[in-house]
């Protein structure tokens, strides 16, 4: 299915970008892309967003394996007839596996996209995180659209 190719694309871009950061930037180094808005910052995270559950790799291994299994099951069962759901799940699957690869082989996740939103210093994130978030937002949009259709 095409949705697995979306996941593979996300994994490839995610891992390539992380490899580039690790090989070419010192930890903590930052390159401004748009001053006071967007930076490429070499950062490592041993937990989830905002450092939640730091150094609890066993927890992330278990949760990710279960989550990936659920996503694959859901893709096989429902994505065949629902294009937007398939794209969403492909993005989520790719993001989950991208960060899982880091946790297994590095014992930490490489983050590098650093954004300041209205002067708020948002936590540094990566391509996998972005794919996960976009996938979730697409599912929310689809759910809202389906709810609207049911009312009509």
UniProtKB/Swiss-Prot annotation:
InterPro entries: Peptidase_A8 (IPR001872). It is a multi-pass membrane protein. The keyword Cell membrane applies. It catalyses: Release of signal peptides from bacterial membrane prolipoproteins. Hydrolyzes -Xaa-Yaa-Zaa-|-(S,diacylglyceryl)Cys-, in which Xaa is hydrophobic (preferably Leu), and Yaa (Ala or Ser) and Zaa (Gly or Ala) have small, neutral side chains. It comes from Bacillus cytotoxicus (strain DSM 22905 / CIP 110041 / 391-98 / NVH 391-98). It is found in: Cell membrane. Belongs to the peptidase A8 family. GO terms for molecular function: aspartic-type endopeptidase activity. Pathway: Protein modification; lipoprotein biosynthesis (signal peptide cleavage). Its EC number is 3.4.23.36. The active site is at residues 111, 129. GO terms for cellular component: plasma membrane. The chain crosses the membrane at residues 55-75, 85-105, 124-144. It comes from the Bacteria. GO terms for biological process: proteolysis. The keyword Iron-sulfur does not apply. This is Lipoprotein signal peptidase. This protein specifically catalyzes the removal of signal peptides from prolipoproteins. Keywords: Aspartyl protease, Cell membrane, Hydrolase, Membrane, Protease, Transmembrane, Transmembrane helix.
